[in-house]
Amino acid sequence: MGKEKKTESYNNDSGSYNYRMFKFYNRKFKINEVTPTDDVRDAFCQFAVGGGGGGTDGDSSDGDGSTGVMGAEQLCSFLDDHGESTTVAEAQRLIDEVIRRRHHVTRFTRHGLDLDDFFNFLFYDDLNPPITPHVHQDMTAPLSHYFIYTGHNSYLTGNQLSSDCSEVPVIKALQRGVRVIELDLWPNSTGTDINVLHGRTLTTPVPLMKCLKSIRDYAFSSSPYPVIITLEDHLTPDLQAKVAEMATQIFGQMLYYPESDSLLEFPSPASLLHRIIISTKPPKEYLESRNPIVKQKDNNVSPSSEDETPRTEEIQTLESMLFDQDFESKSDSDQEDEEASEDQKPAYKRLITIHAGKPKGTVKEEMKVVVDKVRRLSLSEQELDRTCSSNSQDVVRFTQRNLLRIYPKGTRFNSSNYKPLIGWTHGAQMIAFNMQGYGKSLWLMHGMFRANGGCGYVKKPNFLMKKGFHDEVFDPRKKLPVKETLKVKVYMGDGWRMDFSHTHFDAYSPPDFYTKMFIVGVPADNAKKKTKIIEDNWYPIWDEEFSFPLTVPELALLRIEVREYDMSEKDDFGGQTCLPVAELRPGIRSVPLYDKKGEKMKSVRLLMRFIFE
């Protein structure tokens, strides 16, 4: 695919593109000059000196902004008017940066922004981003008060059945800001070491040592807040002890040790800066789970599974690999071996900060809040759906103190993902996603965790943590009054001409772009809108405004997608993004777009305005 040379200016000299029609005929399309919109021009005129609005010196000359200049004080006033508290020095830094990019000169030869400079400033997404780019939420509450960026089978490079296992996806996830890494631990072929792989499949293993070293090296490459390693271990006590030894040696001071076997309350992200914590089932619970027949007789319940295949199959495989080798009969010597292994378990058990489990009885029973300890419970997406339909209040109450992890259903062999909002709206902290399962659900995940500076922890709204006089809690299905209305104006887009060849979207003419917008949140807030199609233009100017009434804006996401209209085939993809509504910065903003994998596109941006009423 050919690339056009990128220019940093959005006010380019006019040119043209030639498209070959039939065999001998060339069709020429003029490239229109990109100019400031009326709203941009009005904003400049209002604040610039000599811009017609008076600026700070009362000059109100021609009113079109063409001769005005916006200095540091005027830019500071503009930013203050947009709800941003800034200093004159910071405003001057922004002016200097715009002038450097556009004119390659210093402020000693240019002292302020003209209209085109101001227009370009608004279109630079690093200088004028749509959401707050730094951590701004309280990070001192217990972990259960946060949505946490969570991966599922973090070591897989592709599908759930036959892809390679590798440390590379773990590294990529950490670099993106994921804070919960899942590793499935199995004995190697000789039973003397530990591999990471998706059991009972054709996935190729990767040594645990590689994964742990990668976590150590990249854990805090994008965020200083704690990394949680969830272990699904299928190991003998001897190998569990080896895991403890590996983790201790590799992580060193990074590894967090809980002060007691059971916590009354989880520690806070702020108290765990640059720490790695472990979450798994305690060894005793694991040993019991390896002989579910006995447990079933005792409890008259069937075990549940977090894995993608039935639990009975897992048990059969585990028994053939481990149980039959070491615990086939209960002779005296076997009992002695088990007692000897107790000497090794404490080292492994001591690592576990977040005790995990799966429902042994009904989910309703498992979700009863225990006063003297906190824990993590794992449910499949189907179990969550059923539980939220019948006992949604129990889910919200449980997640006020405990951690709830949701994982994909077993039929998602292609590593696709589910809709995350049902979990978030019920307070579930760990919505475990396949980070290689590209698509709209993963775009929502990316969007949620752009919040709070992209640190991987997003504070849950206060209403999810409160109880009423009669122990009632938030119900996402309850119809509530509109709290505020979000008005979104889509001015224009640019950057495709720089990132794509001129025939990428259409071999015979420039592209026909349109923008779709979706609100995804509680059921009452879900909505979608679409702009008109702008034909044959690399610089689409829509200049359309849409209103979204919101009952629970704190849990709403704004998903944006640009498509290129195709009369005969499926419309082409032109970029996407997803933004947390609660994080949107009011005013005119530059909104960068991302590709289907969630990677930021080099040049493609939209100019938009957000207003809350």
Swiss-Prot record:
Q: Name one GO cellular component term.
A: plasma membrane
Its EC number(s):
3.1.4.11
Query: Topology relative to the membrane, per the entry?
Result: Peripheral membrane protein
Q: Where is the active site?
A: 152, 198
InterPro entries noted in UniProt: C2_dom, C2_domain_sf, EF-hand-dom_pair, PI-PLC_fam, PLC-like_Pdiesterase_TIM-brl, PLipase_C_PInositol-sp_X_dom, PLipase_C_Pinositol-sp_Y
Check the record and name the PROSITE patterns matching this protein.
C2, PIPLC_X_DOMAIN, PIPLC_Y_DOMAIN
Could you tell me which SUPFAM superfamilies the record lists for this protein?
Answer: C2 domain (Calcium/lipid-binding domain, CaLB), EF-hand, PLC-like phosphodiesterases
Write out the entry's keywords from A to Z. Cell membrane, Hydrolase, Lipid degradation, Lipid metabolism, Membrane, Transducer
Q: What top-level class of enzyme does the UniProt entry assign?
A: hydrolase
Provide the C2 domain boundaries.
466-595
* Single Gene Ontology MF annotation: phosphatidylinositol-4,5-bisphosphate phospholipase C activity
Gene3D superfamilies reported for this sequence: C2 domain, Phosphatidylinositol (PI) phosphodiesterase
Tell me the superkingdom of the source: Eukaryota
Q: Which reaction does it catalyse?
A: a 1,2-diacyl-sn-glycero-3-phospho-(1D-myo-inositol-4,5-bisphosphate) + H2O = 1D-myo-inositol 1,4,5-trisphosphate + a 1,2-diacyl-sn-glycerol + H(+)
The cofactors named for this UniProt entry are: Ca(2+)
The subcellular location is: Cell membrane
- What does this gene product do? The production of the second messenger molecules diacylglycerol (DAG) and inositol 1,4,5-trisphosphate (IP3) is mediated by activated phosphatidylinositol-specific phospholipase C enzymes.
Under which name does UniProt file this protein? Phosphoinositide phospholipase C 6
